[in-house]
């Protein structure tokens, strides 16, 4: 009986508390303010960042890389110049295999070597986040500036990709393990982001300073018996393209 009485007392106390009416405010004691915000499109050009320290800006000399000069919501921001150097021609039945030197960037004013890399940015938002695909093509064969001789069947291969970003979804972005560029100008896939992914800035570096493979990850191959001019610099065009994911 005591237990029933105690339970009843608790119930009555709860009901009593629930019946307390809020205190009415006097005139002038309350005022509702507003908060507003407007988001604008970022129309700045994204500058190169350190592929091994995302978000850290670096300075790259023109001889080391090509930097974007036009703004767009979906952009290729930077690509390394592939420097295969001066090579001595020797008679051989084997193809010539030449590795590209690393890219030198200035980080905090200090020359620092990084693997050759490409940087892209997607600033699209909302329904416009359609995903993207990055590709590359040798759109001009290696050609001598003086004689206009072409290396007809040379290839460039990329290996050991390291994809990096400050974005949390960087693990969802795919970078192809190997990329092979043929002299016929055909396009090769490099990386891609699914719809709803890939917002922000991403780098793909080929070889890293910690893995000691920066000077082994981008390779030019020239078929044996290819006629070549000595004391001539050959230059090729590598076009990197970012587009909506199909």
Please place each PLM-identified region on the residue numbering.
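Signature of Gram-negative chaperone-usher
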Residues: 2-4, 10, 19-246
């Amino acid at each position: 009986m005591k237990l029933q009485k105690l339970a009843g007392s608790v119930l009555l106390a709860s009901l009593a508390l629930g019946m307390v009416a809020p205190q009415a405010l006097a005139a002038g004691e309350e005022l509702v303010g507003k908060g507003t915000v407007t988001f604008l499109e970022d129309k700045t050009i994204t500058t190169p960042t350190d592929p091994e320290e995302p978000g850290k800006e670096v300075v790259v000399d023109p001889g080391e890389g090509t930097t974007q000069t036009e703004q767009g919501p979906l952009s290729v921001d930077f690509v390394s110049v592939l420097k295969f150097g001066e090579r001595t021609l020797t008679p051989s039945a084997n193809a010539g295999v030449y590795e590209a030197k690393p890219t030198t960037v200035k980080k905090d004013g200090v020359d620092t070597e990084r693997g050759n890399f490409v940087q892209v940015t997607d600033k699209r938002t909302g329904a416009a986040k359609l995903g993207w695909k990055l590709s590359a093509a040798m759109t001009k064969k290696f050609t001598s500036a003086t004689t206009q001789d072409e290396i007809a069947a040379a290839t460039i291969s990329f290996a050991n990709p390291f994809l990096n970003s400050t974005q949390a979804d960087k693990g969802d972005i795919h970078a192809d393990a190997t990329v092979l560029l043929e002299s016929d100008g055909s396009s090769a896939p490099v990386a891609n982001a699914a719809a709803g992914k890939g917002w922000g800035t991403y780098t793909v570096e080929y070889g890293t300073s910690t893995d000691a493979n920066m000077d082994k990850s981008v390779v030019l191959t020239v078929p044996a018996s290819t006629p070549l001019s000595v004391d001539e610099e050959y230059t090729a065009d590598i076009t990197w393209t970012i587009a909506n994911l199909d």
